[in-house]
Regions:
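Short, conserved active-site loop motifs that form the nucleotide-linked donor/cofactor pocket
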Residues: 26-28, 79
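Donor-binding/catalytic cores of nucleotide-activated saccharide
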Residues: 37, 58-172, 181-196
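Acidic helix N-cap motif at the loop->helix transition within catalytic regions
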Residues: 11-19, 26, 61, 65-67
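Glycine-rich, basic loop-to-helix element that forms the pyrophosphate-binding segment
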Residues: 32-48
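Short beta-strand/loop segment that forms part of the nucleotide-sugar
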Residues: 1-8, 28-33, 58
Length: 235
């Protein structure tokens, strides 16, 4: 299934979605008022019926075999979560960069475990990309733990990632660049403004602190999370 959330678009997005939905019954369109990424992704999660879940942002694209590779890895390893590397694609120059430190999972360099959990990576967990879109999640795991995005806040993916990563029993990764993050796109949120809502950042920080207390990881990750959010405020 492909669940497309039309989050109050004002361009030709809905017409394009309807064109493809007529050609493929697996495509489901849900139109709603614009309420931000967290709410839109939660609507997708609430309507998902598949065994696994993955996210693709509207202006990005993936390799044709990305989902097949992530799916096979998940099934063969009985995984709750599997990740892949991300490349950037410059919308103006069409230059592809495969070596972005944060998105290329370089923090795993030298890491040998094929299947792991958060304690195996506790020395560098805060360096792992929190983006939801380069990952495949077992839906039963997400539903069992009632994992959702906080709504109407920036950096909502931080909370979702830690909720998944701290609770997942079996995690793995594919050492390939399978997702393409589009940069320099006119009209994108990042292009419009680099201003940050510091109140939102503090709220997200509190949610993660509560999560660490709930999962008994506060003493393991307190320093890492504090450093992470100082970075977000200064970014």
């Amino acid at each position: 299934e492909i669940i497309c959330i039309n989050d109050g678009s004002t361009d030709d997005s809905l017409n394009i979605l309807e064109y493809y939905a007529k050609k493929d019954k697996r495509i489901k369109i849900i139109s709603k008022e614009n309420e931000g990424q967290g709410t839109a992704r939660n609507v997708g999660l609430d309507n998902a019926q598949g065994e696994f879940i993955s996210f693709v942002d509207a202006d990005d694209f993936i390799k044709k075999d990305m989902l097949e590779k992530l799916y096979n890895k998940s099934v063969n390893g009985n995984l709750d979560l599997v990740m892949c590397k991300v490349s950037s694609f410059d919308n103006e120059t069409h230059v592809i960069d495969d070596n972005l430190w944060y998105y290329s999972l370089k923090c795993f360099s030298g890491f040998k475990k094929e299947v792991f959990n958060n304690l195996d990576t506790k020395e560098f967990t805060s360096l792992i990309s929190v983006t939801p879109y380069n990952k495949l999640y077992r839906r039963s795991f997400v539903e069992k733990n009632n994992i959702r995005f906080p709504e109407k806040y920036i950096f909502e993916d931080e909370v979702f990632f830690y909720n998944v990563y701290l609770k997942a029993k079996r995690i793995s990764l594919i050492d390939e660049n399978l997702y393409y993050y589009r940069t320099n796109r006119k009209g994108s949120t990042v292009s419009k403004s680099q201003d940050k809502d510091y109140i939102d950042v503090i709220h997200i920080f509190r949610l993660i602190r509560e999560l660490l207390i709930e999962t008994n990881y506060i003493n393991v990750y307190k320093k890492q999370v504090y450093n992470r959010f100082i970075h977000l405020i200064l970014w």
